[in-house]
From Swiss-Prot:
Annotated source species: Homo sapiens
Region ranges (Disordered): 108-136
Principal subcellular localisation of the protein: membrane
Protein name, UniProt field: RING finger protein 222
UniProt GO MF annotations: zinc ion binding
Compositional bias of kind Pro residues: 116-128
Length: 220
């Protein structure tokens, strides 16, 4: 197989579940780093990185650790979405703890239920790797039948080495954590400066009034 054929073969399938994109029409999603994944794998990844049940507004590429920013849209049925657009339909109410693999380790790209099903007439081929994990949404009556819609933007940034040990914290939380000490130091400096200015003003007023008071007493 030539080098061009090898690149074309690797780019036509999801690097996580190895399903061919041509078998899942409209299911491919491209991150800002250029890596392409199927819709299901990205949604499972988002579900596994939730914090306090909230889906993060950033998505870290499992391959290159590049951060892609997401924007939230109004909730709609996944069947009403344009499958060719850069959207992710994340179901509401699914458990946030990912299942264990055969070795007892957590797999962030595995989930017990699907996030999206192909439209009628575009079913997965028999024996496909991701078919065993597909559960119809009809079998989950206790879960809300709605989804959070996120749009994959073209903007992103590399993930720093100091942030790689905190995959479950969003960039917003990291920025807030870094800004908190700065805000505290700035407030402390402003308080000290205000106290010093007040003290100087009081001393100046006393120094200006005291001679007049002494002069009035001496004349009296």
């Amino acid at each position: 197989m030539s080098e061009g054929e090898s690149k074309d073969s690797s780019g036509s399938e999801c690097p996580v579940c190895y399903e061919k994109f041509r078998d899942l029409e409209g299911a491919s999603r491209t991150l800002s780093c250029g890596h392409v994944f199927c819709h299901d794998c990205l949604v499972k990844y988002l579900l596994s990185t939730r914090v306090d049940g909230q889906v993060q507004r950033t998505l870290v590429c499992p391959i290159c650790r590049y951060v892609t920013f997401l924007s939230k849209k109004s909730s709609r049925w996944p069947s009403m979405l344009d499958k060719s657009s850069q959207t992710l339909a994340v179901p509401v109410g699914l458990p946030s703890v990912p299942p264990l693999d055969s070795l007892g380790h957590t797999n962030p790209l595995a989930a017990s239920s699907p996030a999206w099903r192909p439209p009628p007439g575009q079913a997965r081929p028999p024996g496909s790797p991701g078919q065993s994990a597909q559960l119809p949404l009809d079998l989950l009556p206790s879960l809300p039948r709605e989804s959070q819609i996120f749009v994959i933007s073209r903007h992103g940034m590399p993930l720093g080495e100091q942030d790689s040990v905190l995959p479950r914290r969003s960039l917003a939380e990291l920025s807030e954590a870094s800004l908190a000490p700065r805000s505290a130091r700035a407030f402390c400096c402003r308080s000290r400066a205000l106290l010093l200015i007040t003290l100087i003003a009081v001393v100046a007023v006393v120094a200006a009034i005291l001679p007049w008071v002494l002069l009035v007493r001496k004349q009296a």
